[in-house]
Amino acid sequence: MTDHALLLVNLGSPASTSVADVRRYLNQFLMDPYVIDLPWPVRRLLVSLVLIKRPEQSAHAYASIWWEEGSPLVVLTRRLQAAMAEHWPHGPVEIAMRYGQPALPDVLARLAAQGVRKVTLAPLYPQFADSTVTTVIEQAKQTVSEHQLPLQMRVLQPFYEHPAYIEALAASARPYLEQGYDHLLLSFHGLPERHLKKLFPKGVKHDLRAADCCHGATAEVSSVCYRGQCLATAKAFAQSMGIPDGKWSVSFQSRLGRDKWIEPYTETRLDELAKAGVKKLLVMCPAFVADCIETLEEIGMRGSEQFVEAGGQELVLVPCLNDHPEWVRVLADMCEKA
């Protein structure tokens, strides 16, 4: 074994579907200042209020999608790890979670103890956001610094419109598209608008409701505009598959709280599409590379029920990339070149 590890990092999951484990997980997740970017006292108060009822509700949702092997997100990420090990000859391939287990600091410490000296850190997020990519990088840096770990790190950058990534999306989705459909909805995880606005250069006024978002903007803006990157992913995918305009659209899911989030909202689009006469709706969730509660339960279960109740006939959830062979090949190549 050589001394260069590949570390795949995903969001995380509760240890089980118990209310106590879900509460512990939600507390860690929501108290991250990159997730809820409010002063600590306000964040603590808000999260404490959320934790009164949300853990029980979320525990029920997790139970509805939990596998015999455990959390789908963790199981699928481990499958990806096993597949990636066949493509990474430089050292061990490990996984870590930003929240929950296996914890990122623990994995970094273990790698250092094993004699690893170089780490390619791969946040498994195609698009950039502080609440996903930045928090992973900062926790890794903090761990290395505080514990004086002898690790050199390089980081896989967001790959939202990398041609090979788009090809992997196409390869995984093609069997579902070939079965026929009325409309394709690409549903990305949403974010509060303020998360994006605070990253824009001072003096830049950017319309987060514009149809083309930051298309044509400077790299300084487009590199931090999550909404624009999602739209770029969707457009590149639709073009690669030859899907005509009007037969696909983009939306944003998982809104939490009363703040203004980026639009359009997935829950709104599901009703609109059903009422517009769409009978068979395909939904892809390209912000996620592994299926999780947001895809399996929020879209595959609740979203499907909502769409049918609004007049649609069938909602088909296209699986995430998971451990699809083309995705494994593409990810290995991107990590090699990181």
UniProtKB/Swiss-Prot annotation:
Assigned GO CC terms: cytoplasm
Q: Which UniProt keywords apply?
A: Cytoplasm, Heme biosynthesis, Iron, Lyase, Metal-binding, Porphyrin biosynthesis
Q: Which domain of life is it from?
A: Bacteria
Supply the EC number(s).
Answer: 4.98.1.1
Could you say which residues form the signal peptide? none
Known role: Catalyzes the ferrous insertion into protoporphyrin IX.
Family named by the database record:
Belongs to the ferrochelatase family.
- Protein's UniProt name: Ferrochelatase
* Provenance organism: Pseudomonas putida (strain ATCC 47054 / DSM 6125 / CFBP 8728 / NCIMB 11950 / KT2440)
Taxonomic path? Bacteria, Pseudomonadati, Pseudomonadota, Gammaproteobacteria, Pseudomonadales
